[in-house]
Amino acid sequence: MKVIPLASESLGVRSLALFLKIGKVGILIDPGVALGPKRYALPPAQAEMKALSLAREKIQEYAKKAQIVTISHYHYDHHTPFFEGIYESSSVEKAREIYAGKLLLIKHPTENINNSQKKRAHEFLKNAKEIAKDIKFADSQSFDFGSFTIEFSPPVPHGREGSKLGYVLMVLVDDGKKSVLHASDTQLINDKAVEWIIEKNPDILIAGGPPTYLAHRVGNVKEIGMKNINRIISETNAKIVLDHHIIRDKGYERFFSELDERPLTFAEFLGKESAPLEAYRRELHKLEKGEEVEVPGGIKKFLKGLK
């Protein structure tokens, strides 16, 4: 199995898009990308818009190689909607390119879902059902493709228990030699998700970490996340790849270093330095005005690559 991260915060955008290749079969997991429209009361910097464009190109490129597409929930950084979106780099044409002729294994559109995502799911299905090869609601389901299996968790909270953001699905892909578990937006801060991960004991765990940058709104997620991740480290053999929400916090590296084993970001999994553009949006805007500010080495390399 080839494991190819496509887009995430360590690569400059909001996403946790992943591509898996097993033999001749391509599996595209959570093919969405977005930018936070406001951070520090600022819109995305030019570098973020460029990162969004590059991530969109990558997702479209790998969509052409996929026969199966999975969607954990209906936030726009996890699926590509059928509309023109500036901060999603989306369009009807791009969505059709991703979903047409594919087997879609997706979160149930009306069960264990909040009102916002229910509306998004309705719009998605209204368009996707006309072009997809087949659509299966995947909650708690397993699919056997002969040379590999795809197993989905029951719906688990998007973040903490009782979260108003609804529910997400985790997905485990196993080819008999390697297993990869994509934990989506569980943030590793609810027991249901952690128990399922430990039960499955994957070779690779890919997860969005706790949203520590929102501690003033969501409470003490740092300690909960750290305790749960250390438990996963202790009770599984998983190589942990942690990205998404946690990388929106400038202090993510300190969080990583305090864990019993340091995880990798998507960028590091690919052998690159992390470029957490959103966390440094203030600095990026200042750089664009010609001011001198300090940013991490990975961001410097990303900016240099744009010239």
Curated annotation (Swiss-Prot):
Family statement: Belongs to the UPF0282 family.
Pfam families: Lactamase_B_2
Top-level taxon of the source organism: Archaea
TM helices/strands, residue ranges: none
Source organism (scientific name): Pyrococcus horikoshii (strain ATCC 700860 / DSM 12428 / JCM 9974 / NBRC 100139 / OT-3)
The protein, known as: UPF0282 protein PH1002
Species classification: Archaea, Methanobacteriati, Methanobacteriota, Thermococci, Thermococcales
